[in-house]
Curated annotation (Swiss-Prot):
<dbReference type="GO" id="GO:0036211">
    <property type="term" value="P:protein modification process"/>
</dbReference>
<comment type="similarity">
    <text>Belongs to the NrdI family.</text>
</comment>
<dbReference type="InterPro" id="IPR020852">
    <property type="entry name" value="RNR_Ib_NrdI_bac"/>
</dbReference>
<dbReference type="Pfam" id="PF07972">
    <property type="entry name" value="Flavodoxin_NdrI"/>
</dbReference>
<dbReference type="InterPro" id="IPR004465">
    <property type="entry name" value="RNR_NrdI"/>
</dbReference>
<protein>
    <recommendedName>
        <fullName>Protein NrdI</fullName>
    </recommendedName>
</protein>
<dbReference type="InterPro" id="IPR029039">
    <property type="entry name" value="Flavoprotein-like_sf"/>
</dbReference>
<dbReference type="GO" id="GO:0010181">
    <property type="term" value="F:FMN binding"/>
</dbReference>
<comment type="function">
    <text>Probably involved in ribonucleotide reductase function.</text>
</comment>
Length: 153
């Protein structure tokens, strides 16, 4: 198991209430953005420009792509924009879970931003997908988030 993976104790998990809501970062490539659009949940995008700040006011699941990786190299895996967003305690306190994307070419650091954020925020890592994700990934994530928010179909 990679050193950045931490098992979150089930008793520590705070499940969100209300309407499923996601916050995400996507670079100008828009890979994560395209995935989010397919989910059809309410969402807010973390700005690419570090000078722009946003604040959310409801519980959410954070989607984060992974930058860097390979072997034990994890420095820079979480985009600076996501770190900037989470430096706001109010934003950080409303995060209830994490989903990350990455490239399987990076081996055991595939989508490592998810485990890093899960460990740091003490929230569950709900799912990981590769690059743009597949139709199956979209369906799985829709089910996971719907159930996580207690809105089972």
């Amino acid at each position: 198991m990679h050193k950045d993976i931490k098992i979150v104790d089930a008793s520590a998990i705070v499940k969100p209430t209300g309407t499923p809501y996601v916050v995400y970062f996507s670079s100008i490539s828009n890979n994560t953005h395209r995935f989010i659009e397919k989910l059809e949940f309410e969402h807010t995008r973390i700005p690419v420009n570090l000078d722009e700040q946003i604040e959310v006011n409801q519980e959410y699941v954070l989607f984060c792509p992974t930058y860097s990786g390979g072997g034990e190299y994890t420095s820079g895996a979480v985009p600076k924009q996501v770190i900037h967003f989470l430096n706001n305690k109010h934003n950080r306190d409303l995060c209830r879970g994490v989903i990350s994307s990455g490239n399987t070419n990076f081996g055991n650091t595939f989508a490592i931003a998810g485990p890093i954020l899960s460990k740091k925020l003490n929230v569950p890592l709900l799912y990981q997908f590769e690059l743009l994700g597949t139709k199956n990934d979209v369906e799985q994530v829709q089910t996971i988030i719907t159930n996580f928010f207690g809105k089972a179909k």
